Amino acid sequence: MAARLLLRSLRVLSARSATLPPPSARCSHSGAEARLETPSAKKLTDIGIRRIFSSEHDIFRESVRKFFQEEVIPYHEEWEKAGEVSRELWEKAGKQGLLGINIAEKHGGIGGDLLSTAVTWEEQAYSNCTGPGFSLHSDIVMPYIANYGTKEQIEQFIPQMTAGKCIGAIAMTEPGAGSDLQGVRTNAKRSGSDWILNGSKVFITNGWLSDLVIVVAVTNREARSPAHGISLFLVENGMKGFIKGKKLHKMGMKAQDTAELFFEDVRLPASALLGEENKGFYYLMQELPQERLLIADLAISACEFMFEETRNYVRQRKAFGKTVAHIQTVQHKLAELKTNICVTRAFVDSCLQLHETKRLDSASASMAKYWASELQNTVAYQCVQLHGGWGYMWEYPIAKAYVDARVQPIYGGTNEIMKELIARQIVSDS
């Protein structure tokens, strides 16, 4: 019953958004109940703040927060040791309506709006539990199928992915090709009407548990540029020649399964091609801004979590006969952190609004990802410092947040690549 009510509220929200004025108008205080922005909120993680959200989003946020408190946080330490979350969690998330939120209902998704999706990103960050790969599955993998897949592909995979019964991954990165997607060596060659796939991928999130992987492969080495010869393929777990390597032992995100994948003469039917042949690079460029916005929102939400965790600590910890929070240097550091967090939150929220109306460009998404992920690492460093020796202990949440933050400037395109993309727009004549 709870899940059905949740789905209904999301559908109502989606229907309302079609008749509402544009986001810029909805953000004005005139004629609407004023909502606090993060600088004025009692806590940066409070429910009911930020003008981009509505009361329906607040109701949804409460249910998502409860889900993470009851179904994720109590088991996360166990999953960190296992190097993966349970498949049961995925199906629970599906029943709760937390997967495929922004995928159209006609395709088998929930049919909610982008801001509802953002709620799930933020609440996972507030839980300090990086294990569940829900956002990659729902908001990176599923859109490729929904946007470029055939009717048969959509009907076969989207409903199962929304239910958490089919876990998705995307395989771009290779041992010799990370941010340089044009350096991909994994290839697919025609064999009659089929394709023969060979190659390897590394650092694949959800790779170990995955039931379906979108694989980036070269299909035309004679193309005028590598970008013109890349295609996407849907590879299912269990296909002959598809081998999952070991789970990789990472510095952080220890409960998030990350694997190597190998493809040895995997025979794929023609129906495994996703979209048009040799158009894969363009599909990737089209979808990457959402991935970078996702990383930015996760990053600033993690900053908000770390700030509140640290504020609570320094208000309780005593030194020199008073709480650490009453030491002026600590107060100044907290003031700096909160100011930077609130400024970045305002920018990320503006990017969420732009993306909700399909107006977020690559450079803006790159700015958000670059700035927010750098700030996340700065905040993590300073918050550990404010915890003193206890911040170095794994039992303290800030220690885990510190190591989890380090990958944010690396994946989704390194921050050095983000600067290249931003600079390209600056100097472009068009």
Curated annotation (Swiss-Prot):
List, alphabetically, the GO terms of the cellular component aspect.
cytoplasm; mitochondrial matrix; mitochondrial membrane; mitochondrion
Q: Which residues carry this modification: Phosphoserine?
A: 54-55, 191, 362
Where N6-succinyllysine occurs along the chain? 66, 81, 165, 240, 254, 279, 322
Q: Which domain of life is it from?
A: Eukaryota
Q: Does the keyword Phosphoprotein apply?
A: yes
Reactions it catalyzes = a long-chain 2,3-saturated fatty acyl-CoA + oxidized [electron-transfer flavoprotein] + H(+) = a long-chain (2E)-enoyl-CoA + reduced [electron-transfer flavoprotein]; octanoyl-CoA + oxidized [electron-transfer flavoprotein] + H(+) = (2E)-octenoyl-CoA + reduced [electron-transfer flavoprotein]; decanoyl-CoA + oxidized [electron-transfer flavoprotein] + H(+) = (2E)-decenoyl-CoA + reduced [electron-transfer flavoprotein]; dodecanoyl-CoA + oxidized [electron-transfer flavoprotein] + H(+) = (2E)-dodecenoyl-CoA + reduced [electron-transfer flavoprotein]
* Protein residues bound to FAD: 170-179, 203-205, 317, 328, 385-389, 414-416
Major location, coarse class? mitochondrion
Q: Which cofactor does it need?
A: FAD
Q: From the Swiss-Prot or TrEMBL record, what is one GO molecular function term?
A: long-chain fatty acyl-CoA dehydrogenase activity
GO biological process terms, alphabetically, are:
carnitine catabolic process; carnitine metabolic process, CoA-linked; fatty acid beta-oxidation using acyl-CoA dehydrogenase; fatty acid catabolic process; lipid catabolic process; long-chain fatty acid catabolic process; negative regulation of fatty acid biosynthetic process; negative regulation of fatty acid oxidation
The pH note for this entry is: Optimum pH is 8.0.
Record keywords, A-Z: Acetylation, FAD, Fatty acid metabolism, Flavoprotein, Lipid metabolism, Mitochondrion, Oxidoreductase, Phosphoprotein, Transit peptide
User: Where does the record place it?
Assistant: Mitochondrion matrix
Pfam families (alphabetical)? Acyl-CoA_dh_1, Acyl-CoA_dh_M, Acyl-CoA_dh_N
Instruction: Show the InterPro entries listed in the entry.
Output: Acyl-CoA_dehydrogenase, Acyl-CoA_DH_CS, Acyl-CoA_Oxase/DH_mid-dom, Acyl-CoA_Oxase/DH_mid-dom_sf, AcylCo_DH-like_C, AcylCo_DH/oxidase_C, AcylCoA_DH/ox_N, AcylCoA_DH/ox_N_sf
Q: Where is the transit peptide?
A: 1-30
Q: How is the protein modified post-translationally, according to the record? A: Acetylation at Lys-318 and Lys-322 in proximity of the cofactor-binding sites strongly reduces catalytic activity. These sites are deacetylated by SIRT3.
Q: Tell me where in this chain the PTM N6-acetyllysine is found.
A: 42, 66, 81, 92, 95, 254, 279, 318, 322, 358
Q: Which residues form the active site?
A: 291
Description of how activity is regulated: Inhibited by crotonyl-CoA, 2-octenoyl-CoA and 2-hexadecenoyl-CoA.
User: What does the record give as its pathway?
Assistant: Lipid metabolism; mitochondrial fatty acid beta-oxidation
Oligomeric state and interaction partners are given as: Homotetramer.
Q: Which family does it belong to?
A: Belongs to the acyl-CoA dehydrogenase family.
Q: What is its biological role?
A: Long-chain specific acyl-CoA dehydrogenase is one of the acyl-CoA dehydrogenases that catalyze the first step of mitochondrial fatty acid beta-oxidation, an aerobic process breaking down fatty acids into acetyl-CoA and allowing the production of energy from fats.
Protein name in the entry:
Long-chain specific acyl-CoA dehydrogenase, mitochondrial
